[in-house]
Amino acid sequence: MKTALHSISYSGSWGQAKLPLEEIVQRASTLGYDGIMLAGKRPHASLLDMTPEVRSELRSRMTDAKIEMSCLAGYTNFTADAEHAEVPHREMQIHYVTELSRLAVDLGGTIVRIFTGYEQPLRPYSKAWDLTVSAVKECARRAADVGAIIAVQNHHDLAAHSDAFLMFLKAVDESNCRAAFDAWSPALQSDDYLTAAKKLAPQTVHTTIADYVRVPRFRYQPELVNYRRDEDYIQAVPMGEGFIDYRGFLKALCDHGFDGCVAYEMCSPLRDGNSLEVLDQYARKFAEFMKAHFAYSRSGGYSLHAMK
């Protein structure tokens, strides 16, 4: 396994500090990561801005910093805008993923992470499923033409559960369409994510990690002089302080064939604030967690066989 720092963590998307891409590359190196996961949108690796010259310069910076191009993160929703069928949203997104595949290869990588789709009332589940399977299948075929791999993340509504996710990958049925299987999603669903990891490990090429605690919420009802339980708020915390057993999750993946990239992201408001110092503290804590539990070599990454 090798580690990557997700650039979205320093994008300012949730009110946190924002850094340009070149500074994140250097930060990933300084904080002890093997590579970087680049957000395929502004303010980072947007196709609108990644000219041939910018690509060449970024690849040189990564080489100088000894940082690998671990994954290019695409942002897709293949069920979007059911109200306006005349707009070719899926075609535009397939083209977007195709060009991200070219960008990933230009930067020295192969993996492009994508999402499925969100459910919406105007599109029946079976129709949404078929449309998304078809779109991802075409993305995979076009990515294969340029030497890239599509990695579907269990993030959006469609195929969010681990069983549905496995069914989805089987429905796509393309050799270069693999899994970017994460623990946090099944953990929030109260799914058995350790068992799921064992099932999905052979297809998993990438996983993204963030740790959370549950914050209980109650709403006061004066007519009852009592409280009603609401859904918990999920709060991001430093690695190892949350309720997800990431040591067990990574072991389950590796025991069953995974040897890919483990990325760390800060993709929601953090418990300790949004300053650059806090972002660095969280990113450093993840690198320390990996070194505390797995033996490491620069050439081979983190080894399960020498778990500490």
Question: What residue spans do the PLM features occupy?
Answer:
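Histidine-acidic metal/acid-base catalytic patches
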Residues: 1-32, 108, 159-181, 185-308
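Glycine-rich, proline-tolerant flexible connector loops at the mouths of alpha/beta enzymes
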Residues: 37-59, 117-123
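Short, small-residue-enriched loops and turns at beta-alpha junctions
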Residues: 44-46, 79-80, 119-121, 156-159, ...
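Conserved beta-strand positions in the central sheet of alpha/beta enzyme cores
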Residues: 37, 71, 113, 151, ...
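Active-site acidic/histidine proton-transfer and metal-coordination neighborhood
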Residues: 22-26, 61-68, 80-179, 304
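The substrate-binding groove and active-site-proximal loops of carbohydrate-active enzymes
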Residues: 44, 83-91, 236-240
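N-terminal small/glycine-rich loop or linker at the start of catalytic domains
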Residues: 1-12, 70-83, 116-119
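Short, conserved active-site loops that position catalytic residues or coordinate cofactors/metal ions
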Residues: 31-42, 71-76
